[in-house]
């Protein structure tokens, strides 16, 4: 039963850009809002402010007063309260009335005219925007005072009176990488706590949230530009890992999709195909690849993504309850244990509680005692739960991952992952798995894979992950970039000393107390913040800013170069199309030539295959014989029929008739077998009768001139036919024949 059409749960998707939903909304447009300021000594009795204060107090009261954060260390999860001072985090009674908000002399109202910080201080001139002409009567973004989200107790001591042009020039003079600077960093609760620490120790409560975000954006911008000049070793490491996986696959096989091909396969279904609704996602912790549908990934994050095992207990050794494998895609059970997704899909007692998120795995208690006692014939380990060969009279047991590593036949048919996860599927779509002895015809032998798997488990304790050796060689080179450590082993950036100097200049620009130790601590905090995110950037890419620093000549040069490259690509596309057509024609010619030589070499074999064997193999009688016949000698004859291993029609007739005679006299033969045998014998006899007396060589000689390997088409077949019929060319008539011919003509 397919549950997909009846379930209205969340669907697999990717992150969308906000302009997909609001195409007219500009990212630089400021949306005005007003918040109450903190309470001062003087109390206001204005009714409007009372209403605002009461409303905000009610809203704050509905939220939990104490928030906690989870800390995960060595697999243990602990909680820690996240508490700030009450008078610093809660909005309190506002002393400014609504009518006084337009005042220009109020010390709490800071008018930001035009600033280089477009995110917080720059007010868009909405009168120039067509989509906002209707709103100019209600709100004037140029004349109205503007409040930021964060307001301090006292009057702000930062008043930006510098014009936008001079401010941008000032930032560009601090560092050439800060041209067209725009703050893009967003603070979180952790940053809020660290900002309180900085203000208390270094900046005397002068650093605001906006300045802190500017400093963090500055560090991200500087690192973005410096990282472009650092030699990358990721490609070498990735290449080494691919070669290592391929080598391990050749030696020991694979149960998680690594090493099968250059394109890593899904660890659950071993598929490499993907689309926009079901893409393959790689874990940034263990580099495992899984489909969204196979692992239950509803939403693909913008940054790094970790599988469940790396997220919860990356440093601990995960052991599957159902098999001895330690690699692959894991999910937790309802009791906290680990089980492979593929094990849960193939064991009939297990199922997924949530089919969209594919977790938790339930039904472990339903696994029968007899299944726990089965011994895997591949790894020889007495652990976990095994499945058995689907052949009716075969009881061979093996683990799911052992079968995957050995390359046994495992097919889910037309069942979907959702149906397998819920154990709700039709009987005609049932899954199948066979041992190496009962694999379907055409499936490659698994003997070599079984030997690889046994070798892997016998050497499991001594296997160690290879480490690339090129890093040490790179560190010993004379490159100036390798003399300085730019990243930690965890790919965390290390801020150089120049970053602290740039931060000091930025802080001086705002006129704050500027101890050098404060800039160094901010750089350390930024590095730890990047380490927390696995080395991923804290802001969006700065490519637009870097392109904005180019001159018109440089931009035009890049455009011309791109156009030249585009023309070359078009030419290359045409050449590849022609090469493809030539290759297809050459392959077709080779196939036709091979077919012609096969016909000339063994004409009766070709005649037998086309007119008898192809028809007989596709018949229901032949398929029934494959199922019912168990004698090895008789099965050999059926295999010869499938591969057309008969040189002449007479040889085939003798062997197939002997086959039917043995079946008729076979002791203990069932009635069904005898009936099928008689029908098949009748069919083969009729087919042989159609070609038994056909001289294929004689027919070929009429149309072709065959001399060893040289074959030419005969221009006219008349002489050959005359020779076959004993005819000769036209001769002169005698006198008697002339008189007889005239007599016949006159009498007519």
From Swiss-Prot:
Keyword field contains Protease: no
Top-level taxon: Eukaryota
A Pfam family of this chain: PHD_2
Zinc fingers, C2HC pre-PHD-type class: 317-350
Signal peptide span: none
Keyword Transcription in record: yes
Subcellular localization: Cytoplasm; Nucleus
Xref: SUPFAM superfamilies: FYVE/PHD zinc finger
Residues with Phosphoserine modification: 728
PROSITE patterns, A to Z: EPHD, ZF_PHD_1, ZF_PHD_2
One GO term describing the cellular component: NuA3b histone acetyltransferase complex
GO process annotations (BP): chromatin remodeling; DNA-templated transcription; regulation of transcription by RNA polymerase II
Free-text note on domains in this protein's UniProt record: Residues 156 to 543 compose a region conserved in chromatin associated proteins.
Note: Present with 172 molecules/cell in log phase SD medium.
Record's protein name: NuA3 HAT complex component NTO1
Organism: Saccharomyces cerevisiae (strain ATCC 204508 / S288c) (Baker's yeast)
